[in-house]
Amino acid sequence: MKNTAKLLLLSLAVLAAGACSKSLSEQMKLADNVKIDCNPEVLALVGDKIPVELTVTYPEGYFHPKAMLDVTPVLVYGGGEEMAGPTFTYQGEKVLDNFKVVSKYGGTVREKFSFDYDEGMEQAYLELRGVARYNGKDIPLPAVKVADGVILTQLLADAHGAYSFKKDDYQAVLHEQTEGQVMYDYNSSVVKGSELRSRSIRELQAALEEIASDPRYTVRGTSVVAYASPEGGQEYNAKLSDDRAASAQKAWSKVTGGDAPDNLEVRSVGQDWDGFREAIENSDIVDRDLILRVLSMYSDPAVREREIKNMSAVYTEINKSVFPELRRARFITEVDYQNFTDEELTDLSQRAIDVLDEEGMLRVASISEDPARKAELYQKAVDKFESDRARFNLAALALDDERPDAALRQLDAIRNQDSDVMNAKGVAELQRGDRAAAAEWFRKAGTPEAKANLGLVELLDGNYAAAADQLKGTKGVNGAIADILAGRLDEAEAAVTCNCGRAEYVRAIIAARKGDAAGVRTHLANLEAKDKRLYEQSRKDVEFAKFR
């Protein structure tokens, strides 16, 4: 804003008129030529401050050599509240002091200062108040308005911080498998009666009875898989495996009482090298590593068998403790188990919560709409299962309520300090007002949420170009706001993708800065329909002053 400081400076001229050769009318003409430029013409919040740069240009002869002038910028806002800036003192050339000297030949004075932001400053004006001092007299001078309004667009940003609750691994449908097996004698395909009465088969039968009696179970498939131990040659073992598959298929009818499924799958594997490898890995055989190296070096079954037989001492132990466990047929039933529904979980959490495992407790907490109940369930999961995810979610609930100290206590207790925990700690520091500490945590976390939060820190610090770069491609309106404040209106327009009230507000600002009056009206009308509170705020916003 450019002003002639006529009232302010004329008084100084009048005060010193007796010592000057110029007439009063000439002094008035000089005062008319004094100009004050305010940059920006409309003040704006940048970070935590409202910066101002004043440039005063004055003509030759306006300042008496023995006069002094105190000038105080004052921001008047809200219902008449005032915030005074620093007082600047100027002196004539013959004053013996250490203030800025104003030459009688004229010149320019520049001052930079800032105001702290306070609520209500969207409706404000900046004025200069002066006191002239000459020959022992102090005369207050009339105030001069130099700027109107404060742009607070930065405050539209969502400054809460981005974080997500830890998810549960609850499965609506559990894929399960139950099995039993029968063992065969060396080179035999006969299923002995004792095998059908073995513990393995009894446990399988009990499991099948439970599956049949529980409507939550659905059988997906049943298979009989037969094997031969890798001894005696590949061709011979292939036939032996086939014979065992046939005998096992008949045995299955006895195991199930004749209820063989229509989709029974029967497979013959032949030599069971995979089972052999697993058995060796889990054994305490002295030359275990050597045997495993042979398996990795050779793929030909005959070569493998020959090399292992050459280890005579080892082969005796293998023949005694490993091969017998591979002469078998497996009965496998695969089922789907329909887990508790959300409604059932909620009911169980109220009357029999100890039935729930960790995943069930995390799921029922996640679907609860009552924050207090969520916290109760997460705390139960912490107490019963020492659940880090539940503890993290307790921290997230605290952040929701902007209780950063409570959140940090939970986060510090988590055993696995992963990137999500680091990001959440950054949000807690952000809510505590320590943006530098928050930024450090966000950099350590390195997640997409942390990157967006780092952009938010740049935005709140007033580093708009850096903020726009960090927030590019993120959800929400913060990226668009950073683009607006960085002067990238086209990028800002493209960045707003949602249709919420805050987005309409941002679109209206973009339209206003582009001089699009119709766009301003359209988006403010949309804002009124979507968010009455923000609409009322927009009515005071200096961004739209030219369109009212």
What is each model feature region?
Residues 2-239, 243-507, 511-540, 545-546:
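N-terminal targeting segments with Sec-dependent signals, encompassing both cleavable signal peptides
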